[in-house]
Each structure stands twice: as structure tokens, then as C-alpha cells.
Amino acid sequence: MSDQSDKTKKSHISDNAYAVIVSFAGTVGMTGIMAVVGDSIAYTNSFFAFIVFGLSVYVLSQICSSFRGSSKRNKVFAYIFSTLLSLALHMGASLEKSANVNFKDLKLYLFVILLAVYLAPLVSWLWKAGSDSISKLTVKKNDEKGLDFKQIWAMIFILWLPVFFALYPGAFVYDATEEYTEVISRSFSMHHPLFHVLMLGGIVHLAEYIGLGANTGIAVYTVLQMAVFSAVLAYAVFRLAQKKGLNKKHQLIAILFFGLFPIFPMYAVCSAKDTLFTACVLVVVILLIDHMEDSEEFYGKKRVLFVIASVFMMLFRNNGVYAYIAAIPVIAVIGIVAHFDKKNLSRLMILMLLSFVLYKGTNHCLKIATHATDGEYQEKLTVPIQQLARVYKYAPETFSDEELKQLYEILPEDYLITYNPRISDILKSGFDNGAYAKDKAKYNRLWLDIGMRKPYVYLNAWLVNSYGYWYPDMIINVYGGNQMYTFMYEDSSYFGFETEPPGERHSLFPLLERLYRNISLELFQQRVPVISMLFAPGFVFILFAGHLMGLMKDKKWMLVAAYSPVLLLWATVLLGPTILVRYVLILWCIIPVLVCDRAEKIKV
């Protein structure tokens, strides 16, 4: 009895010692991610650091025993994710502060390791606590009647109506005016997805043609989009009740999340193609999950819907094509490794390839019908353009006279001096597609040669142009200083907000309009601790990535495969022109699905 007591006491002392050591490591490791607010001494020589240490010791002393006694697999995955998270936090802090990461600074790697050691037991605990909470969340009484699809759809749509009237006729922003101009001028290009150009511009121009005015056309498009987007979100909630046993109370919570959290109504009334694109991606992912759980039901009822959603996903955004095509081999490989039913896996591959063929055929027909011009390369070359411009700005001596001459052939000096590390729009608009097309090999070689000499400059050019997608503390203000039709971007460019010509804003609820203006253009929600993270693309991605890593830990490989289009879509925006919420809207839409996907299937 005494031996057992001594053993327990030693274990307790050991756990406490572990908690103290790891807490100190984590407190020191946080120095790198806190330095963004100023000199690191403001953190290291502060009472706040002591509070962090004290609270960490208490928390870790409660959970470290469970982590240390967990399986080797759990520890490995926890350390992998924690290391990646720590690296993201440290690099992101440096990029936010100085638009640069010093990869030769050994302290960076030391701080990354220390913080990773601290985060690992916390990550492990969150995985376990999350699974326990989900099992309680998805328990439904046998006699409990949930909400049906139409009820959920109506509730979400109605909750969005005040925002629609506050921003009436809708937020006609981003590429909307360009797409409308293509329609009225009958001069089309492949720069924007033709299907969306014809749909948006066609509805607005038709309203003008029959005498109702552009505002009516924009309002009609907005209401139709609200109907489609709310229907897809309603389908997601209804499916969670039908398949996972989500009870009525938690259905209502999901409805309120979709109906009231500002990002959803904000993009429901926004004319950008991203809203309908996101709706299609969500349907594709949900149906992929259904396929992995019940293939026979999928092929009996849902395969046509899957093909339709897949085709429209590719029609609405070009990077949707890249993500979808990349997902085919990813799903195939995971399916083979995980020993998924070969017949059903083959049928899924055929459906996905068929969807791609239908997309190509549809897009080609639209191109022929509209005589759309092609031959633009700057969107695909956004990152190389930024990399060359960064070297030109910070290390111009790298270029020889001949290389400088070649650079000016595709990027005139007047544009090179406009280099902005966080957005490439102005710079890439000066890219000479014709010159590049004449000798791609020469200019590709120029890019490669300069990169071999300045690899860290290239790496920083890419990271600073995309870090907001994986770093939670970035203030999204990529358009700062840009004059728009009705305002100038100053402190924030979180959302476009305005109604551009040919539309005109007529708000019925000015106070609500003011709230959304604050969210969009000012440091409003960013000033509120914790709440600010819910609006941050980087934070939402960390939640998504942590969930995926948890699925891998639990060997739920087919669920990982089902989410692969979202991960691959996220990967494509890392190669994009800038950092905006609209490009990763799917990360918020997928949250309720993530919450419930660990629950066992329940027949309702």
C-alpha cells in the first residue's frame, strides 16, 4: 500500500515538474509571436509573461498525465501539428511586422521548437475534448422531431433579409462592374469565368433593357443568390440532423450561426462569384462524405446532384478547376491505401472525370458563343511576378544588364516600382502577355536564374503575399490607400461593401449598414479579443487543419479524402494575387460539418 502511495506521489511530482518545464518553454517560445506588438522586451520583461507562465503550469498539470500516457501515434501527430502551428505563428508575426522572415536567425527555430513542445499536450487535449463534446452534441431522442429542410431554408433566408435591405440592392463589388461591362460591350475574355459574367451581367442588363433599372437587376441577382446559398446551408444543417442525429436545439444554433454571423449575410448579398462557388464546393464535400459513409445510397439518389455541383464549382472559379482535378488522384490514392471498396472508388473516379469533361465542354461552348479572347498569363504567374519585383526592389544588383533588359520586356519599370508585398493587382496589370507568349522559355529561365541566386527573397515574396491564410493575427488591409467609387480604403479592407456603378446604394436600415461598414472598412471586430479570431481566415484554417490532423490520427482516411477539395482549394489561393476572405469563404461554411463528422451515422 505504501509502495503504491509512493509511486503515485512520484508520478504527481513528475507531472508537476513536466508542467513547469513545458510552461517555461512555451512562455519563452511565445516571445517570437508577441514581438509583433513592438520590441520583445515589452513581453519578456512584463508581468503578463508571468501570468502566462502561471496559468500554463496550472492547465498543463491537469492534462499532462493524460498526454504523457497516450499512445505514441497520438503524440507524434500532436507534435507534428504543434510544430507546424508554431512555425506559422512565428513566421506570420515576422511577416506582419516587417513583411520579411529572417530564415538565417537561429532564434526563430529555437522559439518554434519551444512553443511546439508547449502546444502538443494542449492540442492532444483539444482533440479528446472535441470528440467527447461531439458525441454529446449528436445525441437525439428517438421521439424528437427536428426541423425539416424548408423550415431551415426559410429561417436562414429571413435572417439575411435585414442585411439585404440595409445594403440594397446588394454589395455590387470586386469584379462586378468589369463583368457587367463585358456584357453590355459584347467584348468577352476568359479572365473572369464566363458563366458568372453572363449570369450577373445578363440579369443586370436585362433589367435595364426592359426599363426596370440596374438596381432592380442587381437586387434580383442578389435575391436569387441568397435563395441558392441559404438552400445549400440549409441542406448542410438538415443533413446533419438526418445523418448524424443533430438535435433540434443544435440545429437552431447552426441556423443562427449561418443566419447571423456577419460573414454569411455579407457574402449572401455580395455579387462576387465566390458565394455561389462556395455553395457548390460545400455540396461537393457533403456528398463526398455521404459517398464514403454509404456508397449505395449515394449512387441511388445523389450522383446527379454531385455531378451538377462539381460542374458548377468549376464554372464559377478557375482555381476550382485546379482543386477539383488535383482531388481526383488524391482521393484515389487515399482510397487505395485505406482499402476502400474498389468498385465504388472506381465509380467515383468516373463521375469526377465525367464532371470535368462536362465542365470543359460547357466552358468551350460559352467561349465559342461569346467569341471570348484568351491568352492571359498574369493570373497564373502572380507569384513569379511578385518574386521578380521583390528582387528588383530589394536587391537590384542581382540582375545583369541583359537580365534587366529581359525583365523590362515583360514588366515595365513603371510597374515594377509599384511592388506591394501583399497584393499584386497593379503590378500584374502591367505584365506583357504578348511578349511572354513569344518566348516563354527565355522568361521562365530568367525567373529560375534569379531565384537560384536569391531563394530567400523569393520565399518571402510568396509568404508575405499569402500569410493571412494561415496566420490568424493578420489585419486584412491589402487595399489600404486605394480610392473606390464611394470611399477610400484606410484601416481595413476586410470586405468591399459598396454598390458600384451601374448600381446605387439605397439603404433601408442605415444603422445596420453602418455596422457592416465598420466590419468591412474599419478596425472594428479586430479590436475585440477572441471575437476577432472568428473573423480571421488564418484562425479558421488552423481549426480546419487541426481537425484534419485529428482525423489522420484516428485513421479516418476517407473523411480526409472527402475534405481534400477544401484543402486543395486553400492551397491554390496561396498562389493567388492577395489575401481576401472571399477566396476562402468555404472554411466558415464547413464548420458545422466538421463539428459533426466524427459522430457515427444515425438513421432517422
Predicted regions and their residues:
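Specific aromatic-rich, kink-prone transmembrane helix
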Residues: 277-294, 310, 590-594
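Short helix- or helix-capping micro-motifs
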Residues: 251-262, 310-314
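Short acidic/glycine- and proline-prone juxtamembrane loop motifs at membrane-interface regions
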Residues: 266-277
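Extracytoplasmic catalytic/substrate-binding loops of multi-pass membrane glycan-assembly enzymes
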Residues: 167-179, 187-203, 211-212, 216, ...
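Membrane-interface anchor segments at the N-terminal boundary of transmembrane helices
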Residues: 35-52, 216-220, 465-562
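Transmembrane-helix motifs of polytopic, lipid-linked glycan transferases
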Residues: 223-245, 283
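Membrane-interface alpha helices of multi-pass inner-membrane proteins
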Residues: 302-317, 329, 352-358
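Membrane-proximal stem/loop segments at transmembrane-domain junctions that anchor or position
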Residues: 370-506
